[in-house]
């Protein structure tokens, strides 16, 4: 049975709480690093022309979906008994390597190839007889598309002046993404998307210097630039109701150098 948007309100609230927690975590780590190490770390990662590392990451991702004009115009009758099509945020994780080229003390070029494990969830809500908020009469079908993605981000990293054993940074760039699953296999899913994309990525984080390594947490926002929708093989009940699908994600990275 369909609920009255309680599920989606929970996701919205959860996102705000998660972001606030991450920001507090960043500040707490920075304070801990400075309090524990009175002397400035001499690890020297920032002085090397080329440096390397690895990272672990957790993300929440979804589709950005745009309805077609036919669905927005009730006179066409194409919508049938479908009330709404709602992408839902879902969690995943990724891991990869860091390759960093030093351009200046405050500017780096980063290549960070990674493998990501994604799940894209979409709810299709159908209309029913008039019900109540507690016992709605409509129904919901959930479509899940799992994907393993290879991502090749190329980013600029601008760093603030170092203060003791920490410094803030910003990242900006793009990423080429391709799905490891064949398109023929993806065509059997209810809501079908293509497997290649280019994303625009923006992030913010802190470098924290320890005695033998550098730890850098970062929050990064990613927005897909291509329309991934493939209506030819999508479920015919709603394939004409969608005009555009793009990926977006929010990722927490934990970098180690």
Show which residues each predicted segment covers.
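Residues on the lipid-exposed face of transmembrane beta-strands in outer-membrane beta-barrel proteins
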Residues: 54-58, 93-101, 113-115, 152-158, ...
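Short glycine/proline- and aromatic-enriched beta-strand/turn motifs that initiate or cap beta-hairpins
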Residues: 32-91, 257
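Predominantly the C-terminal beta-signal and adjacent terminal strand-loop region
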Residues: 195-197, 205-257
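Cleavable N-terminal export/targeting peptides
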Residues: 1-46
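Flexible, solvent-exposed loop segments that connect beta-strands
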Residues: 66-86, 119-145, 181-193, 229-243
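Structural signature of outer-membrane beta-barrel domains
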Residues: 59-63, 116-120, 175-181, 222-226
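Residues that define the transmembrane beta-barrel architecture of outer-membrane proteins
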Residues: 48-52, 89-93, 146-150, 166, ...
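Outer-membrane beta-barrel channels and translocator barrels
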Residues: 47, 104-106, 161-165, 209-213, ...
């Amino acid at each position: 049975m369909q609920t009255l948007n309680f599920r989606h309100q929970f996701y919205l609230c959860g996102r705000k709480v998660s972001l606030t927690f991450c920001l507090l975590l960043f500040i707490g780590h920075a304070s801990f690093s400075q309090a524990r190490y009175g002397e400035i770390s001499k690890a020297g990662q920032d002085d090397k022309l080329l440096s390397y590392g690895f990272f672990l990451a957790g993300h929440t991702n979804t589709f950005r979906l745009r309805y077609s004009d036919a669905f927005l115009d009730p006179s066409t009758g194409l919508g049938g008994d479908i009330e709404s099509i709602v992408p839902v945020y879902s969690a995943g994780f990724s891991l990869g390597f860091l390759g960093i080229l030093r351009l200046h003390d405050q500017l780096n070029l980063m290549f960070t190839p990674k493998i990501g494990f994604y799940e894209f969830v979409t709810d299709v809500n159908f209309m029913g007889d008039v019900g109540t908020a507690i016992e709605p009469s409509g129904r919901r079908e959930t479509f899940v598309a799992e994907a393993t993605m290879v991502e090749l981000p190329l980013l600029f990293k601008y760093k603030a002046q170092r203060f003791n054993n920490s410094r803030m940074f910003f990242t900006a760039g793009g990423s080429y993404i391709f799905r490891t699953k064949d398109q023929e296999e993806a065509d059997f899913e209810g809501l079908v998307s293509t497997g290649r994309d280019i994303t625009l990525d923006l992030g913010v984080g802190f470098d924290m210097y320890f005695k033998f390594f550098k730890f850098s947490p970062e929050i990064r926002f990613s927005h897909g630039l291509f329309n991934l929708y493939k209506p030819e093989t999508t479920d015919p009940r709603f394939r004409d109701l969608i005009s555009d699908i793009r990926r977006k994600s929010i990722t927490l990275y934990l970098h180690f150098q």
